C-alpha cells in the first residue's frame, strides 16, 4: 500500500500551493534538519541501550 507516483505528485502540489515557492526551500530545510535530529536521537538511544546491557 505504498504511494504511487501520482499520489506523490498530488501531495507535492498541495505542499507547493500551501507554502508557496518562496517558503518551500525553508520548509524543506527545516524538515531535513528535523529528520537528521530524529536519526541522531535514534542512534544515541541505541547506544544508550547497549551501554545499559553491558
From Swiss-Prot:
One of its GO terms (biological process) is protein transport by the Tat complex. The chain crosses the membrane at residues 1-21. The Tat system comprises two distinct complexes: a TatABC complex, containing multiple copies of TatA, TatB and TatC subunits, and a separate TatA complex, containing only TatA subunits. Substrates initially bind to the TatABC complex, which probably triggers association of the separate TatA complex to form the active translocon. Keywords: Cell inner membrane, Cell membrane, Membrane, Protein transport, Translocation, Transmembrane, Transmembrane helix, Transport. NCBIfam families: PRK01470.1, tatAE. The gene is tatA. Its main location: membrane. Belongs to the TatA/E family. GO terms for molecular function: protein transmembrane transporter activity. It comes from the Bacteria. It is a single-pass membrane protein. The lineage of its organism: Bacteria, Pseudomonadati, Pseudomonadota, Alphaproteobacteria, Rickettsiales. GO terms for cellular component: TAT protein transport complex. Part of the twin-arginine translocation (Tat) system that transports large folded proteins containing a characteristic twin-arginine motif in their signal peptide across membranes. TatA could form the protein-conducting channel of the Tat system. InterPro entries: TatA/B/E, TatA/E. It is found in: Cell inner membrane. This is Sec-independent protein translocase protein TatA. Pfam families: TatA_B_E. It comes from Rickettsia canadensis (strain McKiel). The keyword Transmembrane helix applies.
